[in-house]
Amino acid sequence: MVMSENSNISYCQAVANRTSFFTTAYNGIPETLILNTIFWVLLILLFTVLRHQAGDFGRLALVNSNGSKKRWTEIFYSRAASVVDPQPSTSTQVSPRPSTTSQGVPDSTPLSPIQPEEGLFGWIRVTLKLRKETILLHTGPDAVHYLSFQQHLMAVMALVTIVSLVIILPVNFLNGPKENPYDVNAFGRTTMANLSPDSPWLWVHTIITILYIPLVVLIMRRASGRNAFKKAATRTIMISNISSSDRNKTVVRNYMQELFPDVTIENVSIAYNISRLYVRNAEFERVHEARLYCEHHRNRDTLMVKPEMCSCKKENAYEYYQREERKLSGDVARLRASTMNEPLDIAFITVSTVQEAQNIVTHFTPGTYRQWHLVFAPSPDDLFWENLNVNKSHWYLKFFCVNAVLFLVLFFLSTPAMVVSLLNSRPWVKETEGKISPLVADFLPTLMLWTLSALMPVIVAISDKWMRHYTRSKQNYSIMTKCFGYLLMMIMILPSLGLTSAQALLEWGFLNQTDRWQCIFLPDRGSFYVNYIITAAFIGTALELLRFPELIVYIWSLLKAKSKAETPYIRKAILIEFPFGTHYAWTTLVFTIAIVYSVACPLIMPFAMIYICLKHFVDRHNLYFAYGPSNMISRKGGKIHSTAVTMTKFSVVILVLVMAMICFFRGDNGMARFLLLIISLAITLTLFTFMSPIKRCAATRRPSIVEIAGPAPIYVPDVLKDNGIRTSSVRPSAAAFGGYGSDSVSEYDSSQYSVNSVEA
């Protein structure tokens, strides 16, 4: 930025030097791009080789307990997870999901096989040719909504990229002052800082900034708009705050029938405290799977087990698991019996029609004796049954403590920019700075920042699982909003102000250092984010394909296993659901950074476009081939999707605010542009607050989930269903993943959905 005073120039340059050390032309962007491209090619080749070695086994092979000879690559990188057995199941196993009939026969439409992969890189063509109908049937409506959200972002970013390269970049590059302080090869010459404060060409940036508001809103509203999806009413109502004396099916049924005599009540279920039973049943499943493995093994007598992890003592595996199974079977039976004596204050009542349920929820008023709270029940699959026993007061206390600790740690102490600042202050860095290759010096900071910022969502996700949310949709929503907020502050807002932590932000406010505002969007700051997005686009997306975190969890589980007989159970347990909360936050953050910097630093947009395209391709592949189905159906189950669309509004709001501040602090000649931008910002905030053009999930009354004929979902946890102890072992236990994971592709009735109902 061309500052009005030399002192401000030196001050801002000093601030920039504390958060990055770029030394070459274009601030290391060519070097970072070259290194990232090389690493991306190597990682893609590694993934392709691993996938080719995996063979055509597919995700459904996980449920085959006889697959003892499978290699680890067959679990993570298998190629043929595309075909579902179209034949109805003839087993007597209890269906783990409401997508099956009461007899346990799947009633979903079988998937159409995709074309087989041909050649080493055939997986790329197969991924690109995946149809929306196939993804919907195979992975669930959440995946279709998520991919549709990304496609709308791609449309916005494509238009912004064209404007940035065709209009803004030539204006910035060709209309600098005669005595230009930037070299022709300097990155600053491509930014808005190249224009003098009194240049009339700055009106181009102002007008484009204002035009971006309707552009983003009109396109992104189609990602929710009339499809504020998965908010439809169901026939089942969840009743909470039931007193201990009323926790009985008969009492609940009679009271509701007395209040609503014209309503036909089909079923009443009481929730029970299954937290201990859930853990014990998971242990039983592990031992049961291991016993079956030993029973079908060719050399059953030679299989040995180590009862203790750090012990050399061994014994016959079949006898050990047989003994442990009998013991755990008795424990589970006793816990099931005791669980029935621990009813919770939650009940589920199913009526005959959606209209009757709507009438009950609308007209029910708590009485003087029974202060019940009625809401539409989430899907049984969306519930964490083992968490329903958590007291609300304890939950809110834990919520406050967890978020306070997260705020102190992530917001004040460990921002990525602070780590770079600390490294730059070390003497050995200053001594070796001239000796280090510029190629390495420009590449490592952004790679390190990307790595540190990638750890933050992991910390947030772990803490949220410890909080024990009641539903998967609420857990994903909480993770998404917190990750987006922390990432936005840590990755964009604080570094853009030349601050390394929120602590520095407070010090700045108390010391009244107004010169800081003049450091907004220095040329080096824009190049920093260009390098950051390049790293996220190439190395970040390639690592998402390889899924090293899941691989580490898998290897650690194998190391903890007492024998190789536990391997089939471990292989089932690694199939988790796609973490929508984290990925929504990451995608929206990069979109926000790109839009905010698109006017001041137009070179950021091509790389942001590359990021969203690669991210969409990688997520498309992983959703179909790597992760289990997701179906967060509840009255507010679509809130995570509609809120992600709403969060895109932050990009244009911050863009207008930043452009207004730049006009204000660059001298008196920009006051007209400043006033125009402030008026536009006020109008935008007013519309977003009172007349939001992006419809919220709660705004529509038209059901988007069609109630189908047949029995309603059974609101009973799997561990309490008939024959649940024995047959629940066919499901992959997700105890290690906080209740996530499944082995069935048809976990929901896909006939409830169509592609048109989940995509604008």
From Swiss-Prot:
Residues 50-152, 221-398, 464-478, 547-568, 611-634, 695-760 are cytoplasmic. The gene is Tmem63. Its main location: membrane. It comes from the Eukaryota. This is Mechanosensitive cation channel Tmem63. The keyword Transmembrane applies. Disulfide bonds: none annotated. One of its GO terms (biological process) is regulation of response to food. It comes from Drosophila melanogaster (Fruit fly). GO terms for molecular function: calcium-activated cation channel activity; mechanosensitive monoatomic cation channel activity; mechanosensitive monoatomic ion channel activity. The keyword Protein transport does not apply. InterPro entries: Csc1-like, CSC1/OSCA1-like_7TM, CSC1/OSCA1-like_cyt, Csc1/OSCA1-like_N. One of its GO terms (cellular component) is lysosomal membrane. Residues 228-391 are annotated as: Intracellular linker IL2. Mechanosensitive cation channel involved in lysosomal morphology and sensitivity to food texture and humidity. Acts as a regulator of lysosomal morphology by mediating lysosomal mechanosensitivity. Mechanosensitive cation channel in multidendritic neurons (md-L) in the tongue required to discriminate particle sizes in food: acts by promoting activation of md-L neurons in response to mechanical stimuli. Also acts as a sensor of humidity change in olfactory sensory neurons. Expressed in multidendritic neurons (md-L) in the fly tongue. Expressed in multiple humidity responsive neurons.
